[in-house]
Curated annotation (Swiss-Prot):
GO terms for molecular function: ferrochelatase activity; metal ion binding. The keyword Protein biosynthesis does not apply. Gene3D superfamilies: 3.40.50.1400. Fe-coproporphyrin III binds at Y12, R29, R45, Y46, S53, Y124. Keywords: Cytoplasm, Heme biosynthesis, Iron, Lyase, Metal-binding, Porphyrin biosynthesis. GO terms for cellular component: cytoplasm. Its main location: cytoplasm. It is found in: Cytoplasm. It comes from Bacillus anthracis. It holds the Pfam family Ferrochelatase. This is Coproporphyrin III ferrochelatase 1. It is an enzyme of class 4 (lyase).
């Protein structure tokens, strides 16, 4: 009989319906309810992208497809997928409890974020491992980062190339690629967090692969807190690149995210487009990985490599 291995797929989570927004936001704010103004602002953002984010559906599809693919590419072990979310049910701890109840003794934990940071990957895996230790007889093997995975870089190289191939030579000369990820508080840099360096590396790999000479790294979707967050913000960067170098076509690659959701559909497709419209420039944004076969193949390689290194 094949050994059963847990596949713990973790992600940020998103409201399933408008009524969930307040409790979701309260969880993000560690139990502090948002003010009516803050709640209204977030609700309006969701309404602007069609009422609710497609993220919940995409995340589940990614996880299910990954489980299926892992069981197709090898027959030594049988992977069982469990979904654990940071800010809404099914919570990470609930997924770990379910694994334990099912008699799983080893699990590979994959966060749907390519870059490592203490705020994201470390906290997700930490929560899972803490719960597993409480329950006993369950070891969780966390994947730190997978931004260097060749198929991940290739996904974005192909996506960027598909945008540039539709441009004339003249437009290409005046085009710039902005590679971005979710901003985090600046204090992580002083703590030696590798997150900013990993994004810079990712941008270099993609630009090299796609043969794009003009590119820059930006940060987006910063939180509404008094602490300074990593910059430059993509909107400010857009204006600056236009003023300084006269770029008239902007290609946004939000590579820190793996799916279409609020941060991409609103912060890029709406807020960045407002800026490009204002300066008379063209706006482009390649398709997100979502649950595409190419992306699922990438994640499959990531999990298989981790499993081989620890078991």
């Amino acid at each position: 009989m094949k050994k059963k291995i847990g596949l713990l797929v973790m992600a940020y989570g998103t409201p399933y319906k408008e009524e969930d927004i307040e409790r979701y936001y309260t969880h993000i704010r560690r139990g502090r309810k948002p003010s009516p103004e803050m709640l209204e602002d977030l609700t309006e953002r969701y309404r602007a992208i069609g009422g609710i984010s497609p993220l919940a559906t995409i995340t589940l599809e990614q996880a299910k497809k990954l489980e299926k693919r892992l069981n197709e590419v090898q027959d030594e072990v049988e992977y069982h997928m469990y979904l654990g979310l940071k800010h809404i049910e099914p919570f990470i701890e609930d997924a770990v409890k379910e694994m334990h109840n099912d008699g799983i003794q080893d699990a590979i934990a994959l966060v749907l974020a390519p870059h490592y940071s203490t705020f994201s990957v470390k906290s997700y895996v930490g929560r899972a491992q803490e719960e597993a230790e409480k329950l006993g007889n369950l070891t969780i093997h966390g994947i730190d980062s997978w931004y260097k995975e060749p198929k991940f870089i290739q996904y974005w190289v192909d996506a960027v190339k598909s945008i540039y191939s539709g441009m004339s030579d003249a437009e290409r000369e005046k085009a710039v690629l902005i590679v971005s990820a979710h901003s985090l508080p600046e204090k992580i840099i002083a703590m030696g967090d590798p997150y900013p360096d990993q994004l810079n590396e990712t941008a270099d790999y993609i630009a090299r692969g796609a043969e794009v000479a003009n590119y820059a790294v930006g940060w987006q979707s910063a939180g509404n807190t008094p602490d300074p967050w990593i910059g430059p913000d993509v909107q400010d960067l857009t204006r600056e690149l236009n003023e300084k170098y006269g770029y008239t076509s902007f290609v946004y690659a939000p590579v820190g995210f793996v799916a279409e959701h609020l941060e991409v559909l609103y912060d890029n497709d709406f807020e960045c487009k407002v800026v490009t419209d204002e300066i008379g420039a063209k706006y482009y944004r390649p398709e997100m990985p979502n649950a595409s076969d190419a992306f699922i193949d990438c994640l499959t390689d990531v999990v298989v490599k981790k499993k081989e290194s620890v078991m």
